[in-house]
Amino acid sequence: LSAGRMVGLSACLAGTLLQKADYSGKFFPNMPFYGVWWVAAVLLICVAVCAIFGAINGIVVSYLQVPAFIGTLGMQLIVYGVCLVYTNATPIGGYRAAYTEVAKGQLFGFIPYLFLIALAVGIVMWFVYNKMPHGKYMYAIGGNEQAAEVSGVNTKKTKIIIYITAAACYALGGFLVGAKSGGSSVNMGYGWELEAIAACTIGGVSVNGGIGRISGVLIGVLVFEILKTCLQYLGVDTNYQYIAQGIVIVVAIALDIRKYIAKK
């Protein structure tokens, strides 16, 4: 549940470090700029910061035995508070072209960088979860954590790695959405964790764990975004769009639970 707030933190952190030198509201007036290398360094900083919060999530859930729902809910508030303290709730803008080009640029003039980045992340995650031991451990824990532990899987370590990996992806998402929008605020990413749950469920990921594919997640994200785009194209009022998205989330999860009960 801390996904959206980590996206916002990453977007704000990247924004404050990649503002134009002559921007009047610059957070760090004397911040040097080293071109593309600095943009890459800022991305690594965002990933590292979010990974720390992800590791804390994993430790709290694994070693303190706090339910994941409660642990990540608490982390959501912590990350939001950190972001408020860091930015003083001030909107951030005036980004350097080298940063915004990451999200708005195109390869060969027609392939968006964002598409290539999403494709690359999808391929890496597919390889990790289908060809590496960590992926098999993850599915085992999702299916039956007690059985996985008896089988010799280090469940605590695996869950911490899962939370760190997820946080790193949130950081990348925040970095990119900040570049795409050309500005950020503490409320960026608010509620996105629910959209993520809906997209994953639509893509065949079970909320009960142990079932799901990376390809399904990508399809689920595409379907959910097409739904939002269609509602906007049809001129549906924004307030009604939220209602429609909420219905999709409830129906998708309800159908998943019914399938789970039927299998049992």
Descriptions of predicted regions:
Residues 1-55, 108:
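Membrane-embedded helix boundary and interhelical linker motif in transport proteins
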Residues 11-15, 46-50, 76-83, 115-127, ...:
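Hydrophobic core segments of alpha-helical transmembrane domains in multi-pass membrane transport
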Residues 70, 154-178, 190, 194:
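Transmembrane alpha-helices
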Residues 170, 180-245:
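Transmembrane alpha-helical segments in multi-pass inner-membrane proteins
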